[in-house]
């Protein structure tokens, strides 16, 4: 595998735990501890897509690292049971070699599977993310550039619509905001009636626009009212057939202003969010959206160390 990785490769993931440069450091600090903890580790890909953005080539994945948890990892004691590490990763390719990787492993979901839950109950449903309903996420070989561009355009246009903020209307109650987001907001025209929104552990999964608004979007908007989606921007925006993907490291920076999202008391700390969005475009609309967010890193920024909480239990 090292033949496909340049010496200057950079890997970013798990908050600042694994912000590493060079093959040796990535091997010693990321992969070796993983392989010690999960000796039979293997990867299962649900989505594989690629494309170009700003003259850079990217390949992105929604995967699960699967193995038997036999030795501690990140200070969490082993269970000797199967663990599925939800892993979303995006790699920049130059001359057929990886020069930079962005890796989000859902450590909160890992903690949940290990039998711990030291934070507030998720609003959405917890559980393993399924593969795309169309069954073609890993075997997507559509080279139709027009379709790829159409998919990316749809997801980016939907994201732009999120900049409309009914929560900033001084006369709007929470019920008014909720009604607007479900019934009147521009986003409605982009989402499939049977949409699925697969969120990170700590937030959970939601079905339909109503579920999405109730279990993630409205609480998120009430907590981060001053968020700005556009100033920082993305490091990647790609379309590949009926799929598209965007990512920011970080792409959003805002104050943690209420306890609606994640449940912790507001402290107005400025929070950075590292996030990816993977989209399935089906029947002319966005059917499914997989959204890895580094929740452990967000919690750490507001003064909540989820790994310390485990040891206090």
Feature annotation, model-predicted:
Residues 1, 118-181:
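Short, low-complexity N-terminal intrinsically disordered segments enriched in polar/charged residues
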Residues 48-147, 221, 234-313:
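A beta-strand edge to alpha-helix "cap/lid" segment located at domain peripheries
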Residues 1-18:
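Single conserved hydrophobic/aromatic residue that forms the stacking wall/gate
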Residues 33-48, 219-234:
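A short, amphipathic edge element
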């Amino acid at each position: 595998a090292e033949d496909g990785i340049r010496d200057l490769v950079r890997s970013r993931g798990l908050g600042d735990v694994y912000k590493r440069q060079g093959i040796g450091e990535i091997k010693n600090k990321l992969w070796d501890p993983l392989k010690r903890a999960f000796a039979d580790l293997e990867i299962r890909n649900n989505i594989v897509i690629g494309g170009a953005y700003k003259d850079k080539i990217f390949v992105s994945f929604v995967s699960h690292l699967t193995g038997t948890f036999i030795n501690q990892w990140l200070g969490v004691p082993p269970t000797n049971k199967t663990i599925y590490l939800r892993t979303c990763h995006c790699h920049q390719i130059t001359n057929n070699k990886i020069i930079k990787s962005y890796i989000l492993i859902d450590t909160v979901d890992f903690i949940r599977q290990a039998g711990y839950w030291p934070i507030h109950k998720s609003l959405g449903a917890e559980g393993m993310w399924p593969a795309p309903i169309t069954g073609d996420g890993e075997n997507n070989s559509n080279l139709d550039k027009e379709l790829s561009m159409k998919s990316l355009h749809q997801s980016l246009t939907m994201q732009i619509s999120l900049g409309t903020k009914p929560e900033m209307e001084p006369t709007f109650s929470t019920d008014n905001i909720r009604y607007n987001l479900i019934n009147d907001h521009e986003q409605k025209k982009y989402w499939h009636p049977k949409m699925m929104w697969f969120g990170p552990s700590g937030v959970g999964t939601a079905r339909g626009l109503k579920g999405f608004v109730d279990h993630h979007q409205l609480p998120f908007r009430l907590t981060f009212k001053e968020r700005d989606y556009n100033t920082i921007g993305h490091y990647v925006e790609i379309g590949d057939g009926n799929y598209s993907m965007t990512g920011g490291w970080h792409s959003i920076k805002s104050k943690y202003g209420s306890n609606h999202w994640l449940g912790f008391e507001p402290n107005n700390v400025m929070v950075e969010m590292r996030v990816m969005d993977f989209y399935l475009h089906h029947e002319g609309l966005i059917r499914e959206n997989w959204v890895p967010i580094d929740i452990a890193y967000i919690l750490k920024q507001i003064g909540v160390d989820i790994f310390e909480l485990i040891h206090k239990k």
